[in-house]
């Protein structure tokens, strides 16, 4: 069949060439953005005297009919018309006649698709920011209930020092806060209109790019038409921010997976967020956390894929840019789904406070408290470190913990020890006394919750 751009050609492509080159199977996700952009373009053409009021009215009515069908899911797309733009143009012509062909005046598919993607990310990044805030609120709620819940803190996945569980959860709150700020900052680059840049050099028609940008809710326009149609840095910035967000979600997923294992038993996931085994009846697998951990690599791949596509492209538009969309769609779906799943997972998980507390009493995570105790009494910290290290070794040989040692053994190690040492070794006391700003002390955690609530608008 004859192409809308086929005037220069004597032959039509083979069907397999059409199928290979078509993007409608995935860029139909931009249908609402494409129609919305066309409505603004038509209104601008009328304002500039390029379309009459009657022409613009007919085009607007036709586009609104198509938009309603899109919302109802009744539009039928064809690879014969390659992409979302030509499919919509063909449908508009069928709806209102040859007048539909006037809509493309002063516009190219190059600036049209860039506009569609800017509109798409404007909407979805705004939604992602809302989802991050909902997840942050879930973390705050769980943290508030666990300020004095104590568990081992880890370095190298070895028990290191006792900490407040709320302190641990709030670490992720602040990571998410930075993620949120990155997305907000990215919106400055997303909220720019390329509409009217044309194929690469602008247009000879007396259009008003600022007017169409205003109608679409953009803050500004691209100052250079080559830049506006050819760069995808706004998508890369979104993918980069998404990769960092997913990295944070993956780290928490890893901890969730560990914590709900029989080796830890610190938490129990709600049945909604776990699955069983087809062979082993006893299994309760943390599949949602594992999937989020796995999908993080997928988002990394989307980012690196577009970086690789972009690195060798001369100005301006190249067909390679058809490959910029699937990774963007995939990342949006993955990020939105991961945040929604994680919010529910945190809200419904059961915290086994007693098991967490018991874990702090069956290790040497209070050894630092012992070294600090000696240092506060005047012993150089390096010497105190050596003394306590030897006490830990002695305990390991005897199969006991520091709190089990007889007071005489402490005195043999140093005359600076007094009987208050057993209070110092208590995990609750150890956490309570860590009063430095940003630390795990209960008072500091309460202050951190106040700041977190302010950031979350609670």
Swiss-Prot record:
Catalytic activity as recorded in UniProt: 2-(N(omega)-L-arginino)succinate = fumarate + L-arginine
Biological process annotations from GO: arginine biosynthetic process via ornithine; L-arginine biosynthetic process
PROSITE patterns for this protein: FUMARATE_LYASES
Biological classification of the source: Bacteria, Bacillati, Bacillota, Bacilli, Bacillales
Entry keyword annotation includes Cell membrane: no
Record-given protein name: Argininosuccinate lyase
InterPro entries from the UniProt entry: Arg_succ_lyase_C (IPR029419), Argininosuccinate_lyase (IPR009049), Fumarase/histidase_N (IPR024083), Fumarate_lyase_CS (IPR020557), Fumarate_lyase_fam (IPR000362), Fumarate_lyase_N (IPR022761), L-Aspartase-like (IPR008948)
Entry's EC annotation: 4.3.2.1
GO-annotated cellular components: cytosol
Taxonomic source organism: Bacillus velezensis (strain DSM 23117 / BGSC 10A6 / LMG 26770 / FZB42) (Bacillus amyloliquefaciens subsp. plantarum)
Gene that encodes it: argH
